[in-house]
Amino acid sequence: MTRIDPKAVVDPSAELDEGVTVGPFTVIGPDVQVGAGTRVGPHVVINGPTRLGRNNRIHPFASIGDDPQDKKYAGEPTRLEIGDDNVIREYVTLNRGTPEAGGLTRLGDRNWIMAYSHVAHDCRLGNDITFANSASLAGHVDVEDHAILGGFALVHQFCRIGAYAFCGFGSVINRDVLPFTTVSGHMAQPHGINVVGLRRHGMGPERIRELKRAYRLIFKSGKRLDDALEELRLLGKENPDLEHLAAFIAASNRGILR
């Protein structure tokens, strides 16, 4: 059964599925869809067009689906889409997209977004991502599955964070972070393969060994990046992880942290 606290304000056009709960002093605007089993705590503001999937947990004072923080934005109907089973903690801000980039900000499933974090317009987040407190993305940032951003990590617009990457506390990231790697510092620099994280996700020694080999090729061999990439592509024909690394590098517009 859907339960809406009498002190909440829910627009009549908002669509709340079965089992949704809405806490006191929360405001849900028009053109909002909330999936079954989602719990929206007190003092939350959700503006549309926004779609939330099933079984999300929205904690107090989160701002979901407000206008993009872009001076060019002129009120166009852009969107925010959030998948299933996400945890969005206190004071998180998730902004809608802008028309210049297709009008969509998207979060996938099972992400853990801790207090005071910010996801700006047109960002695309995959699944199983963790943001520690006050991690912030500028606009147009892509974050792949299983990435972790430490507290107060800051990511420049148009950067990409690769799958299973770990970005340390306070990192300032102005270029793409390769999948499977760790970076930290101001300005952030790479520090090797994310061995601890990969082991926690069940990756075996041989798989990690091959990734370390690829890391040495890219960062320690002294080769030009184009030459290292060609060699990595050959290795990737028999290794999906290395194939993903090569494709990630080839698709980079801002360049990689190196």
From Swiss-Prot:
GO terms for cellular component: cytoplasm; membrane. InterPro entries: Acetyltransf_C, Acetyltransf_C_sf, Hexapep, Hexapep_transf_CS, Lipid_A_LpxA, Trimer_LpxA-like_sf. It comes from the Bacteria. It is found in: Cytoplasm. Its main location: cytoplasm. One of its GO terms (biological process) is lipid A biosynthetic process. It catalyses: a (3R)-hydroxyacyl-[ACP] + UDP-N-acetyl-alpha-D-glucosamine = a UDP-3-O-[(3R)-3-hydroxyacyl]-N-acetyl-alpha-D-glucosamine + holo-[ACP]. Keywords: Acyltransferase, Cytoplasm, Lipid A biosynthesis, Lipid biosynthesis, Lipid metabolism, Repeat, Transferase. Involved in the biosynthesis of lipid A, a phosphorylated glycolipid that anchors the lipopolysaccharide to the outer membrane of the cell. Belongs to the transferase hexapeptide repeat family. LpxA subfamily. This is Acyl-[acyl-carrier-protein]--UDP-N-acetylglucosamine O-acyltransferase.
